[in-house]
């Protein structure tokens, strides 16, 4: 029988980088087409975020050069603010590091894995370092970066510096990757950039394909989105560990000041109410009579905390004083049990909904501009819903765009999270289920699958509830599902109104053309019967038709459809 010490001889600590090196599929690196798209996604989202935060209209150029079979060089260049030299190894070589992961703020990337994951994938498939060229306006830094997967650290294997007489600013990265494939499919790079251009009409995006063809998605809006605002956590959306960890990191003088300063919707008055709720919970738990305990808890749930306290006579005042002392001590001395009591009380208390001023949707006008510029439809509409919350305190917002007809050939669902296209795992996404739940026939769309209709849905949040670290599918949460449905129905009503008018116009055109078709024969017959000139008879009937069947101006397409 083996001894415990022998069993643990192979025990080793694994770094984050080592874990994701072995489980690259969790980051979206699965399949030859998807892996290449994921690399582009990580680089482009970084570029867009950086440009917007710096107040720069994005110019992004993507080049894909074929070096051999399933072997490519990927180049992504932007005109962003650049990266300070000392941060290069951290940005490109350290997992779970970044400017967004630790902040309660809306952004395209959230986990601090993205671009370093792309660098690692390039490294493990080609063995080559990633070349980074960047400048913040001063000298140009050229660095070759690799990841030390054992230490989860970036390592610059070579570095050069160049003068910058023209004052160029931006970042260019070059990755060499193998076991990937470029195709113009709906899960490929071209489609990803096309969808990115629709949701980001302020960005100019260029793609040089492996065959040398240049594809340009021009900017259709000069408005730079306002940068999102960091938001404080809401009491209804935190766990015990959140409160405990935040308290021990806080520099505030007391737990009271910590709660008021670092959470939204908590004032001094609310802290006084919190003290009452914690006191009431302690007293209820000390009650031995089960029936009495249940009745008191029901009262507390209904919000009648004062009535609960009075039920314990003089006892409650002493307990209240003990709880009040918790609020006066240093937050770094808050115990786990006290943090549990705070969160338990939060769940029973009533708070205003969290502020939503930090959310930055695309906006109805920009959605229409993006859809019109890229898809060339005959009809377009957009709806941006008012912000809501899920999970008690996490703000989110839903917006929808519909594009119909024109150059659109068939139906398509364009899924986005914080303006980022979601190309994979559509079946498990709340957006897909919400779109499929709509009875499109009510809105004059006989068959959604064959209709020339594009549905765009963008979910905006400081914390998008993705189903996995691959960030390609949004969890089916009731509040989000319902908001998407409401937005879709609003937009679909507008489409229905447009189609109703279009069908009426087409019907009138068809009636008129049918009557005009038989007019020569009618005129000829009446000429024989009455002796009146044919032209005079035709002129009379033409005026009669025009007076009885008024036809609004129709497009050439509508006229052709009416004839058909």
UniProtKB/Swiss-Prot annotation:
Keyword Oxidoreductase listed: no
Keyword annotations from UniProtKB, A to Z: ATP-binding, DNA-binding, Isomerase, Nucleotide-binding, Topoisomerase
InterPro entries reported in the protein's UniProt record: HATPase_C_sf (IPR036890), Ribosomal_Su5_D2-typ_SF (IPR020568), Ribsml_uS5_D2-typ_fold_subgr (IPR014721), TopoVI_B (IPR005734), TopoVI_B_transducer (IPR015320)
Catalysed transformations (reactions): ATP-dependent breakage, passage and rejoining of double-stranded DNA
Signal peptide annotation: none
Keyword DNA-binding found: yes
Top-rank taxon: Archaea
Family: Belongs to the TOP6B family.
Described function: Relaxes both positive and negative superturns and exhibits a strong decatenase activity.
Family matches, as HAMAP family: Top6B
Protein name per Swiss-Prot or TrEMBL: Type 2 DNA topoisomerase 6 subunit B
Organism of origin: Pyrococcus abyssi (strain GE5 / Orsay)
């Amino acid at each position: 029988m083996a001894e415990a010490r022998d069993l643990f001889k192979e025990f080793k600590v694994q770094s984050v980088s080592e874990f994701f090196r072995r489980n690259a599929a969790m980051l979206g690196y699965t399949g030859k087409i998807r892996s290449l798209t994921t690399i582009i996604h990580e680089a482009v989202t970084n570029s867009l975020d950086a440009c917007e935060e710096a107040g720069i209209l994005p110019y992004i150029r993507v080049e894909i050069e074929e070096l051999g079979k399933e072997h490519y060089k990927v180049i992504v260049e932007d005109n962003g603010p650049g990266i300070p030299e000392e941060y290069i190894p951290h940005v490109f070589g350290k997992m779970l590091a970044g400017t967004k992961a630790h902040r309660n703020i809306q952004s395209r990337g959230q986990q601090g894995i993205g671009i370093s994951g792309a660098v690692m994938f390039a490294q493990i498939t080609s063995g080559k370092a990633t070349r980074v060229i960047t400048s913040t306006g001063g000298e140009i830094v050229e660095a070759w970066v690799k990841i030390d997967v054992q230490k989860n650290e970036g390592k610059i294997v070579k570095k050069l510096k160049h003068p910058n007489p023209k004052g160029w600013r931006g970042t260019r990265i070059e990755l060499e990757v193998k076991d990937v494939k470029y195709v113009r499919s709906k899960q490929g790079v071209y489609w990803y950039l096309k969808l990115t251009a629709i949701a980001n009409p302020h960005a100019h995006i260029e793609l040089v394909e492996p065959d040398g063809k240049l594809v340009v998605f021009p900017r259709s809006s000069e408005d730079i989105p306002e940068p999102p605002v960091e938001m404080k956590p809401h009491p209804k959306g935190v766990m015990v560990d959140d409160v405990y960890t935040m308290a021990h990191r806080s520099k505030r003088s007391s737990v009271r000041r910590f709660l008021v300063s670092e959470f939204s919707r908590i004032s001094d008055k609310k802290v006084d109410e919190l003290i009452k709720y914690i006191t009431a919970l302690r007293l209820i738990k000390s009650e031995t009579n089960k029936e009495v305990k249940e009745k008191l808890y029901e009262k507390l749930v209904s919000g009648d905390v004062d009535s609960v306290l009075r039920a314990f006579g003089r006892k409650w005042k002493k307990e209240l004083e003990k709880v009040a002392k918790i609020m006066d001590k240093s937050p770094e001395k808050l115990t786990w049990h006290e943090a549990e009591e705070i969160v338990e009380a939060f769940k029973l208390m009533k708070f205003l909904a969290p502020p939503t001023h930090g959310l930055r949707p695309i906006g109805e006008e920009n959605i229409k501009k993006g859809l019109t510029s890229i898809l060339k439809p005959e009809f377009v509409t957009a709806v941006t819903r008012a912000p809501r919350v899920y999970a008690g305190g996490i703000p989110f917002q839903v917006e929808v765009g519909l594009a119909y007809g024109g150059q659109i050939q068939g139906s398509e669902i364009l899924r986005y999270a914080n303006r980022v296209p979601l190309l994979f795992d559509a079946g498990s996404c709340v957006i897909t289920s919400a779109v499929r739940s709509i009875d499109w026939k009510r809105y004059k769309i006989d068959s959604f699958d064959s209709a020339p209709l594009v549905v765009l849905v963008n979910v905006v949040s400081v914390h998008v509830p993705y189903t996995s670290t691959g960030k390609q599918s949004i969890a089916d949460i009731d509040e989000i599902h319902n908001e998407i449905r409401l937005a879709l129905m609003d937009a679909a009503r507008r489409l229905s109104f447009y189609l109703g008018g279009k069908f009426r116009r087409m019907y009138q055109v068809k009636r008129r053309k049918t009557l005009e078709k038989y007019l020569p024969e009618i005129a000829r017959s009446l000429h024989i019967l009455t002796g009146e000139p044919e032209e005079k008879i035709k002129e009379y009937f033409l005026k009669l038709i025009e007076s009885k069947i008024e036809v609004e101006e129709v497009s050439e397409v509508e006229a052709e459809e009416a004839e058909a």
